[in-house]
Amino acid sequence: MGTTASTAQQTVSASAFESVHGIGTMEDQRSLSIHSFQTLGLHNSKAKSIITNKVAPVVITYNCREEFQIHDDLLKANYTVGRISDATLEHYLVQGKYFMVRDVYSKLDVLNTTASCGAPNFRQAKGGYAVFGMGQPSLGGFKLVLQKLQREGHKECVFFCVREEPVLFLRVESDFVPYTPRGKENLHENLHSLRRGLRVEDLELTIRKEIHDFAQLSEGVYYVYNDIERFRDEPHTVRVQGEEDIHVTEEVYRRPIFLLPTYRYHRLPLPVDGAPLEEQFDAFICFLRESSGLLLRDPSRPPPALLFSCQTGVGRTNLAMALGTLILHHHRGAAPKPDPPHPAKMPPRARFRVIQSFIEMVPKGQQMVEEVDSVIASCSEMHDMKEAIYESKKKLEGIGEDYQIQGNSTKEYFLQRTLQSLERYFYLIAFNYYLHEQYPLGFALSFSRWMCRHPELYRLQAIMNSSELTITGDLITKGTRVLVVDERFCPDVLSTVKEMSVANFRRVPKMPIYGTAQPSSKALGSVLRYLTDAKRKHSRILWVSLREEVVLEGNEQIYTLREPGSLDQLIPVPVSTPEQLEKLESTLKGDLLKSQKWLEVYLEAEKQMKMFKSCLTTQEIFNQHKSTCQGLTYRRIPIPDFCAPKEQDFDRLLEAMKSALAEDSQTAFVFNCASGRGRTTTAMVIAVLTLWHFNGIPEMSEEEIVSVPDAKYTKGEFEVVMKVVQLLPDGHRMKKEVDMALDTVSETMTPMHYHLREIIICTYRQGRSGKDEQERRLLRLRSLQYLERYIYLILFNSYLHLEKKDSWQRPFSLWMREVAAVAGVYEVLDGLGFPELEQLEDEEPLRKLRGRWRAQSGAGWPSRGDLV
């Protein structure tokens, strides 16, 4: 009994479909086209039975001489059909929802180069660099482009398609013309931000098979759209007899290798907005390393021509051309910077704060920025990437707070556009820094590994939006931001207000280390009297405020600024020095007292209107008490909430403690944040470790056997933690000492149920069962931040041990860059996660330093100040 597959393809009526499959009616949107069971009519007179299974229906014919197995691979009876409008034809949709739209139209070719060069917007970078850019060509057009480059004497060519969206080439007359799948909601927009792990090449192959199958079901034609402006005569049909009538990008661009041995092709998907990911920079460098002409500075052998293409030949192509021009600039190895191709069209603009910080931080930073500026100018015939930042910023500044488009804040839209353009510019500068170091070494390190050796760049990009530094009191007087009293969200769980006048006041047993919530001026007096009384006798006190948000005392109550729609969330101010925050508080205080307006304030349980008769900054609160407590020293060391202090925060805390102990070895240390909880506990642990290194580390007790669920994780034995422990000299001891310090500090705060180590697994578990995606993502971020904070404490303890011989002359931040980074610590932090508890996604942004540090820097708040 032989088995053959039926090739008949017809549309099945609903009744026929139901009679075969025994199912009810189907949705109208779904096509009923499958391999036709009406072909059974050929054998109906003899058929004895129909046997169906999950694979396909099988027809057993008369006396079992023949068997037909009808495969339903094409459709499985659920291909989706749709139409763009009621007036247009209904047809099959690729991927169940997309229409195939002609990729390039005539208006797109601004430079009018399609006829002469073969591709729209074909151009060369200025300054004599063999760097070319273009929009999407057809198959025939691409052949013309290669011929043009050959005629101009370019013997070698490396071509990069930088499109992240799928592109298919359909046979139209004698050429293959590019089409892209697009959604009905926005026919002008290509697909982007594809599912992580999905290769665009694989998606193109899938869509090709779909189009071929659809054509088989539609008499050998498929429907496409050439004119999405007027929809004249749309949709058009293209004839598809076989898969050879459809080319994928790989076929169009890779096949010339057989005719041109010195030609190379690579797919390098770049994002439409923002900077490429580190992995994309890595791929670019990896491709370039294959070309010896780029690595060797051989005057007799010119480097290959670099050709880049996206859809329009503008945004992504411009970015790629700039990357290519930087490569060729370093290949020349000549002048410190390329000569500008033409005089500047406008006066120099003020640099953004993040770029100025880069210049101040990096040796030859000024030169690196100027080189990038010159390269951008070389590639600016179609689009000036640097100018685009200022244009977006100008639009941002001209938009009112309440202006909305389609329910979304237009101001937020232009803020994101500005920040994405600025990020792209910043990463070009970082890439040039990388080339300065790595080009002479033959790219010994990939870009992603090199970035892990320069964590300061990640710290910089995390505070790209420094608009909070420019806010004024108008925000409060107009009600855009409101003042919220600290007590509203900082409960006194340790019940110390009655005795100490401040919430959550506590001491580390047998150590002069204290923690507390934010005190008012009056409460501060009570605490200072307690610390200097006859029992405690602290003659010198170092008080450190850890708050990174604006804090003001008005009418003897402590307030912070918050968004009316998010009263429970503090707004961090991204400062590089504590003085910036104190200056901002002074400005806001002056604005409030000057206004003499009734202000909307939120107290513990109610909302009131108040006019401030008095207003003090945190600095002024402490200055008031220096006359009565002459041994008091006050420091503002802002550290981020929920996460590890930054490297420089450890520097400042250690330096403050060293200075205090140099003057008096019995100094008392007091730390406060808003509630006296997270940041305060972190600083208290840092202080405990520091004092132990000054006075001697106590002996560790026998390790207790913990018989509770998740005991291993409660003890902090996560895979990623143990990876760091294995890197560190005597790493297990480093971790145990930190655990001992954490347990020592947590003994003082049992009612808070807050333990810096144990909270990691608790938060992770909460995140797995969050009520919605937003909550799950936030808890996911928190669990990773708590994990990172724990690792940083272990690293800091290791630093205290290893640098003790030199009295910690080298700051922790420098040690992290010069020692820990080289050992691979930041590479571990760049892949943070819980592999023992879940299947990790390598590309999850929060696992990466770039995504995680940006998320903790207050990103997501409405922009209230000016980008500077």
From Swiss-Prot:
Keywords: Cytoplasm, Lipoprotein, Myristate. A lipid is attached at G2 (N-myristoyl glycine). GO terms for cellular component: cytoplasm; cytosol; nucleus. SMART domains: PTPlike_phytase. It is found in: Cytoplasm, Cytosol. GO terms for molecular function: protein tyrosine phosphatase activity. It comes from the Eukaryota. InterPro entries: Prot-tyrosine_phosphatase-like, PTP. Belongs to the paladin family. This is Paladin. It comes from Gallus gallus (Chicken). The lineage of its organism: Eukaryota, Metazoa, Chordata, Craniata, Vertebrata.
